Every structure is written in C-alpha cells, then in structure tokens.
C-alpha cells in the first residue's frame, strides 16, 4: 500500500538539541499493521543542518524500518499505540519526562542478545517488564550505539504532544 501523510513535526516542535547523530524519524502505522509496508515514515531523516532542524526525504509507507520496528512491536501489546519517534538521549530529558508524569521504561544494551533487532528486543523487553506500552522507552547506548529516547503514542499528534511537554 502506498500513500502520503503529513507529520506535525517542524522547527517549532523540535529543538536542534533533540536531534541525535543518526537523525530523527517518526512513524505512524495503519490500524492492524502487520509489516513495514503498513507503516508510514520519512524516507530519510529529520536532521540538524547549521543549527536548524530539516526534514530530509519524503513521507511514505514502508520507508522507516528502524522506528517502524518500535511501532509494530508496541502494537503487538496495544494495537492503539500506532506512532513513535526517536530523539537524542539526555538525562535532563528523562528527568523532565518524569516530572511531566510520562510513563517511562529503560533497557540496557549490555543485555541485548546477538543477532536481534535492538528496536524490537528493547521495546519488547520494556513492555513485558512494565506490563503496558509506556510513553517513553530509552537506553543509554553502548559500544558504537548512540543513546536514544523513543516517544510512543496513539498518533503523530500524540507523540508530538509528548515531545512538546519535554521542550
């Protein structure tokens, strides 16, 4: 299935400090999504260029496998949680999320099995431990792996609303 979707992400919603080295992506799945082709994302990333936040790439289905894995995993536990976004990890952002009463889960990459998708394994590990899909899943990175915060919600608007709470 092919299609287009507008995501409510722009420079007003994103501070350059939130953009990780790998860039940001945001995804939104169709109801009953089963695979990457059922998940809309950016064919590229949201990146920081010259201190400004820019979207590099079109928005379409089947494009962001990295963040789509988070969405598809979350939907196995709660079909209503159909959107996710990754942002740069910072301890201050996690503290602010706690102050804003967002639900938070953490996984440690040191315990990650070999030959698995970090996004699937990490998301599943946190969700199973908590018993629900949290607003935030984060890790502190590892050798060659950037620390990351993932924001999960029912829609891109829900995810961006949670992001705005962290600004």
Task: List each model region and its residues.
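Conserved mixed alpha/beta catalytic, RNA-binding, or beta-rich assembly cores of soluble enzyme
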Residues: 1-167
């Amino acid at each position: 299935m092919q299609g287009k979707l507008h995501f409510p992400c722009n420079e007003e919603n994103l501070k350059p400090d939130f953009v990780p080295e790998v860039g940001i992506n945001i995804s939104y799945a169709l109801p009953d999504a089963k695979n990457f082709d059922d998940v809309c994302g950016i064919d590229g990333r949201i990146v920081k260029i010259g201190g400004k936040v820019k979207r590099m790439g079109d928005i379409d289905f089947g494009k962001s496998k990295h963040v789509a894995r988070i969405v598809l995993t979350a939907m196995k536990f709660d079909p209503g949680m159909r959107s996710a976004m990754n942002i740069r990890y910072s301890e201050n952002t996690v503290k602010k999320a706690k102050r804003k009463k967002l639900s938070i889960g953490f996984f440690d990459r040191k315990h990650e099995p070999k030959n698995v998708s970090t996004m699937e394994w990490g998301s599943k590990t946190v969700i199973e431990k908590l018993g629900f899909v949290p607003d935030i899943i984060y890790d502190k990175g590892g050798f060659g792996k950037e620390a990351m915060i993932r924001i999960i919600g029912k829609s891109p608007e829900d995810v961006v609303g949670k992001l705005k709470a962290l600004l």
